[in-house]
């Protein structure tokens, strides 16, 4: 759970035209759902056609100290109040992490309103880790 809450980059694995398709995404996790945003494209088409997906998240300090989570879940597109809530969570979590020149204003998010907010309800989660303590 900690890895899912802490990180913001995941990989989603899904089936696209009968083949495995894995794509990195930014996300936010609320304890039940992984929320993401996407413009119309291959990722959304694949998840709409095959809503059972896999989500992978990792936290790597170095090759001897890492944690990872693999979760299976069901994709759904958000509408109405769910869209607004998902978009707000994503903006609140991800915007502070953007690196912008000092004199540049924050990005205008209105263009993203044309995209889709989706969520993946996680059904089954597994985790692995390696931790080597220094001598």
Sequence positions of predicted segments:
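Surface-exposed, gly/pro-biased binding rims or lids
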Residues: 61
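Extreme N-terminal tail/first-helix region
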Residues: 1-5
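Broad gene-expression machinery/nucleic-acid interaction feature
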Residues: 22-24, 52, 70, 117
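A short macromolecule-binding patch
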Residues: 46
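Short beta-strand segments
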Residues: 7-39, 55-56
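Charged, gly/pro-rich active-site loop segments
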Residues: 64-135
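Active-site-adjacent structural patch at catalytic or cofactor/ligand-binding sites
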Residues: 39, 49-58, 67-76
């Amino acid at each position: 759970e900690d890895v899912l809450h802490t990180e913001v980059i995941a990989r989603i694995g899904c089936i696209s035209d009968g083949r495995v398709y894995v794509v990195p995404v930014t996300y936010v996790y609320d304890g039940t759902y992984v929320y993401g945003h996407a413009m119309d494209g291959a990722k959304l088409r694949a998840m709409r056609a095959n809503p059972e997906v896999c989500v992978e998240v990792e936290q790597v300090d170095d090759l001897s100290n890492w944690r990872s989570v693999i979760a299976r879940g069901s994709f759904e597109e958000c509408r109405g109040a769910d869209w607004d809530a998902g978009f707000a969570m994503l903006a609140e979590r991800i915007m502070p992490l953007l690196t912008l020149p000092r004199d540049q204003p924050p990005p205008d998010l209105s263009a993203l309103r044309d995209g889709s907010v989706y969520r993946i309800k996680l059904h089954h989660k597994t985790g692995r880790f390696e931790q080597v303590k220094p001598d």
